Amino acid sequence: MIEQINKDGEKKNSTDTRTIVITSGKGGVGKTTTTANLGMSIARLGYKVALIDADVGLRNLDLLLGLENRVIYTAMEVFEGECCLDQALIRDKRWSNLALLAISKTRQRYHLTRRNMEMLVDSIRLRNYNFILIDCPAGIDVGFVNAVAPAEEAVVVTTPEITSIRDADRVAGLLEASGIYEVKLLVNRVRPDMIQKNDMLSVRDVQEMLGIPLLGAIPEDTNVIVSTNRGQPLVLNKKLTLSGISFENAARRLVGRKEYLVNLETGNKGLLKRVQQFLTGSEENV
């Protein structure tokens, strides 16, 4: 199995590869959508990118990329010696420097270990990828532990909701405990109209509460549904919406380019105080 994974890659330099886990703790915040759009945007900037769908048995990243009919082999077959890693890495036809690796097929479950993930990522690094983005399973159980094991950096995705913020705070602590200190925040599904009515926390409020450097903010967009059904990330639309522009902006910031953050309005300090009280357990009369 080790020989299958490392075939033809032993002498290549992998020191320049950045391995980033995209995580959230809470499901339904747009983590997989974020992975697809950041990955595609980074590839369009000229970098070689590998995306790993680490959600065992519940993969969706292939659907968002329009690659579901091309997934013949997965990491499971690689580990079992049925194929080599290069056969399981599916190259995107639109941007050949973007590849997808699924851990398992939809109805399969594989007992993945931390060692499996580390070996897998090490082998991808040997193929001279500039970026490896790992789409982490929702939750903080063994799937989370395995997905973050090979990562050196993390992007925490949250929404401006108290439950999502609290989960993001817990995930940030777990990442630090795992030795991942390069963590950035992406606030998704922002509603400027609700912020103006003081019904939603602003992006700045969320960032200040979590104390994590802000990578970007993505507005709520009904085009996400259309994008998912078409298997085409928002950033590939001919006419970019604000959410598509925001994803591209975040991708440029992630690769180190100096880009201004997309401003999605300001918030209300009274609402911020109420949520802070809730998160700290002192929500009397809230």
Curated annotation (Swiss-Prot):
Keywords of the record: ATP-binding, Cell cycle, Cell division, Chloroplast, Nucleotide-binding, Plastid, Septation
Annotated positions binding ATP: 26-33
Keyword Flavoprotein set for record: no
InterPro entries: CobQ/CobB/MinD/ParA_Nub-bd_dom, MinD, MinD_FleN, P-loop_NTPase, ParA/MinD_ATPase
Intracellular or extracellular location(s): Plastid, Chloroplast
SUPFAM superfamilies referenced in this protein's UniProt entry, alphabetically: P-loop containing nucleoside triphosphate hydrolases
Annotated GO biological process: cell division; negative regulation of cell division
GO molecular function, a single term: ATP hydrolysis activity
Pfam family, one: CbiA
A GO cellular-component term linked to this record: cytoplasmic side of plasma membrane
Chain's role: ATPase required for the correct placement of the division site.
UniProt record similarity statement: Belongs to the ParA family. MinD subfamily.
Record NCBIfam families: minD_bact (TIGR01968)
The protein's name in its UniProt record: Putative septum site-determining protein MinD
Protein's gene: minD
